[in-house]
């Protein structure tokens, strides 16, 4: 990681190209003392850019420590990407920097810090502490995403609870406890974790049971299943043919489509479309209901996802009641 960043104070004043490149934008100044080559930076994914910015900010600071989402990124934990995300830092001694020293792309939080770790030259809190910070600063949904990924790396719920206990009395402690309680070590993706968080928070009129990595049929595994009946399919970001669309298949012949949306089965057939169609048909024939949503739609319109789940379950129950009444 360190070779990607240039420590500006280490460059001699008579360097033949660096200072000119820094002035003309060939090198980007990510932090007061850290620069990165423009082509390298723009070639990274948003997630990698945010991680690099966090490391640059910490390496450019004298005492500040990365916390919350920024710490999670440095440790490789799941964090949902946002172009509006700022680097999150804290100062020792539970203090805040003077206003004239604050950077517009950073957020300083007043919090007690443990002894920091050093990762890629950046001072940061531990992965367990990062999870707790995300839960208390950003809420249950993003906290559960981070907690699930922490458990995947081998951090236990016991370790999370111990770290939480060491912090003493803090705000939003109830949210932290809920995140730890509901976290699991088998979530297949941050989007599956986010969807599960939405389902946990939703006020459903029926009992709801969730299973992660559910084997619905031989050779067909779902990221998330509700009540052993409703399969939640979350298209990955590179599945362009389903991005921005959602469909809910009810029974062998009926498809419920949200207004204005295009379902995967109406798009011109591609090899992946054929696989999805065959998979959905097998699931429907076996009595499952498939709810498909893109990651973008899930994160940008969470209330729509919950509304679709409620509408889907209601429609299925109404169809079953109508069928029974005809018998």
What are these regions (language model features)?
Residues 6-13, 151-327:
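Surface segments flanking catalytic/ligand-binding clefts of nucleic-acid enzymes
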Residues 1-172, 208, 314, 318-327:
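Short gly/ser-rich loop at a beta-strand->alpha-helix junction or flexible surface loop bordering the NTP-binding
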């Amino acid at each position: 990681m360190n070779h990607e960043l240039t420590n500006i104070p280490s460059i001699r004043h008579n360097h033949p190209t660096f200072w000119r490149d820094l002035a003309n934008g060939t090198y980007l100044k990510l932090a007061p003392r850290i620069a990165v080559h423009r082509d390298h930076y723009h070639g990274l994914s948003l997630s990698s850019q945010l991680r690099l910015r966090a490391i640059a900010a910490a390496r450019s600071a004298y005492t500040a420590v990365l916390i919350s989402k920024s710490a999670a990124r440095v440790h490789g934990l799941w964090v949902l990407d946002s172009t509006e995300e700022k680097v999150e830092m804290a100062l020792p001694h539970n203090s805040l920097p003077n206003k004239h020293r604050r950077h517009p792309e950073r957020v300083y939080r007043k919090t007690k810090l443990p002894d920091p770790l050093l990762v890629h030259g950046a001072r940061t809190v531990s992965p367990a502490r990062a999870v707790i910070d995300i839960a208390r600063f950003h809420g249950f949904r993003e906290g559960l995403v981070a907690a699930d990924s922490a458990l995947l790396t081998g951090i236990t719920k016991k370790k999370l609870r111990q770290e939480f206990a060491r912090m003493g009395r803090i705000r939003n402690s109830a949210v932290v406890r809920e995140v730890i309680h509901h976290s699991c070590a088998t979530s297949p993706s941050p989007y599956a974790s986010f969807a599960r968080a939405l389902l946990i928070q939703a006020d459903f009129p029926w009992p709801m049971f969730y299973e992660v990595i559910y084997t619905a049929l031989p050779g067909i595994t779902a990221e998330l299943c509700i009540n052993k009946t409703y399969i939640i399919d979350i298209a990955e970001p590179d599945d362009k043919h389903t991005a921005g669309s959602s469909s809910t298949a009810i029974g062998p012949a009926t498809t419920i489509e949200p207004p204005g949306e295009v379902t995967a089965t109406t798009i011109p057939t591609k090899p992946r479309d054929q696989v999805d169609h065959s998979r959905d048909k097998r699931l429907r024939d076996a009595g499952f209901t498939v709810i498909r949503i893109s990651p973008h739609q899930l994160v940008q319109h969470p209330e729509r996802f919950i509304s679709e789940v409620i509408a889907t379950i209601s429609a299925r129950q109404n169809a079953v009641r109508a069928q029974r009444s005809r018998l």
